[in-house]
């Protein structure tokens, strides 16, 4: 078992930064030791947003984006090493999720695409990288997502308490940790993605800090109901989605039937959409005693309050209360998945993704052995 220090790197669908986490991991323990949030340059963020919404690129432009993201991830790792005064030889491996630019697990040729050249990360950090975590699961008939429920189960499952873990990133996803039942999990729909897209277009702000703008508005019930009629919400699990589906174009199509709405009312309605679609899935699954929230949305007081109101009898809290920072959960999960890969252990849960079997995930990009001085 490759016990030791691992680094997890995550750039999610919210594109609010690169999360980098340092953890000590073995078969009995995952202990977070440090973390860092590394900024994504505005121009690079926009390039990723454009490709996620279907903008065509030349092969040269696509290759450049792949390289630039790899360099960005390497810089983020090196930033953490410098912050903690560590050397490459102190780290067993990096688990890098990459940047998802397209996710299409259905259709004649199911696929998912995460970019950010792992070779650049190895070359610039001198540390072995484990990446490309999702495509093996898709090759086995799965959704390739979500992968984090396995980590949630390992750290947060309880023998008697009915728990669910909710990650609200760009997309929201649930992990259902119910005693005596197989772990299940799936994407419920948009998390922060549509709220962030709307305030960016209307106010040139990256996100609605403390939901201040949404709290000034009122929910437009006809608009909310129209959005809730989207077939994704009624589709059975396993299911997963992303920015290629729930994007600004999706929102614009719904707004065409409602001209003249106040912008703040649209924001309030999008916050309600996130809360309602999550709570409906919690209730459809039989409910839970405790809903533990992580991701950027855990800091949205309006969404958190609405979840509590829509789920009476459920304690709505954050994973911070269990000692795991909600901001670092996903990066920590991919550090753990890298450890599982190097240990030859399966990283997916077929009960979650729908894959035909559990499997070791990812590809290993080995670093050169340290040079010895003669």
UniProtKB/Swiss-Prot annotation:
GO MF terms held by the record: ATP binding; kinase activity; phosphotransferase activity, alcohol group as acceptor
The UniProt record lists the keyword Chaperone: no
Pathway assignment: Amino-sugar metabolism; 1,6-anhydro-N-acetylmuramate degradation; Cell wall biogenesis; peptidoglycan recycling
Binding residues annotated for ATP, in chain numbering: 12-19
UniProt catalytic activity: 1,6-anhydro-N-acetyl-beta-muramate + ATP + H2O = N-acetyl-D-muramate 6-phosphate + ADP + H(+)
Gene Ontology biological process: 1,6-anhydro-N-acetyl-beta-muramic acid catabolic process; amino sugar metabolic process; peptidoglycan turnover
EC number assigned by the record: 2.7.1.170
Keyword vocabulary terms for this entry: ATP-binding, Carbohydrate metabolism, Kinase, Nucleotide-binding, Transferase
Highest taxon above the source species: Bacteria
Record's keyword annotation contains Amino-acid biosynthesis: no
Record NCBIfam families: PRK09585.1-1, PRK09585.1-3, PRK09585.3-2
Function, in words: Catalyzes the specific phosphorylation of 1,6-anhydro-N-acetylmuramic acid (anhMurNAc) with the simultaneous cleavage of the 1,6-anhydro ring, generating MurNAc-6-P. Is required for the utilization of anhMurNAc either imported from the medium or derived from its own cell wall murein, and thus plays a role in cell wall recycling.
Family the entry assigns: Belongs to the anhydro-N-acetylmuramic acid kinase family.
PANTHER family associated with the record: ANHYDRO-N-ACETYLMURAMIC ACID KINASE (PTHR30605:SF0)
Protein name per the record: Anhydro-N-acetylmuramic acid kinase
Originating species: Escherichia fergusonii (strain ATCC 35469 / DSM 13698 / CCUG 18766 / IAM 14443 / JCM 21226 / LMG 7866 / NBRC 102419 / NCTC 12128 / CDC 0568-73)
Encoding gene, per UniProt annotation: anmK
